[in-house]
Amino acid sequence: DAATGGLQRVSLTAGGGERNQGTESASRVVAPALSGDGRWVAFATTASNMVAGDTNGKQDVFVVNIATGAVSRASTTASGVQGDGDSPIGQGERPSLSYDGGLVAFSTAAGNLGTSPGNVLARNLGNGALLALSSQSGGAVGAPVSSRTGAYVVFGASTALDARYPGNSGLFSRFTGLQRAWWWID
């Protein structure tokens, strides 16, 4: 808490209550991502009570406004359809936030969020748009990292995503279309 310098719990439900454990063990470490401005945190959990209507029984990505406690689920379509697989793919894999928390990127095992299972998605938290950053079938992707503005996301892939490099895995960068202006006053 910036005002008091005290400790603040941010993994509470949208109603301010305790999250249930879902299918995860009580000792599971939740791997959070913090926005560069310190206002937003993203994390994954199988808890089914973080937001109303979470009935998919899968691991989902949630974003919390630290100042207000508002919680939103990022791993749904723009119209609210729940993923049919875990997001991110592995327990302990963390989502990535842009500096201002306007974009969250994550891997997904869901096949109904605009791409096949095993790809990387990005949610524009400003307008709710969900963008498929990769569209491979087979192989594995993960560990997305957002640029400061959210305009680019870099992630690893175990199969070639670019026809110029057949058969090669590696790191790939994708433009998200998110454009922001940044101003600093020193």
Task: Describe every region a protein language model picked out.
Residues 1-186:
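Conserved "turn/edge" positions that cap or connect secondary-structure elements
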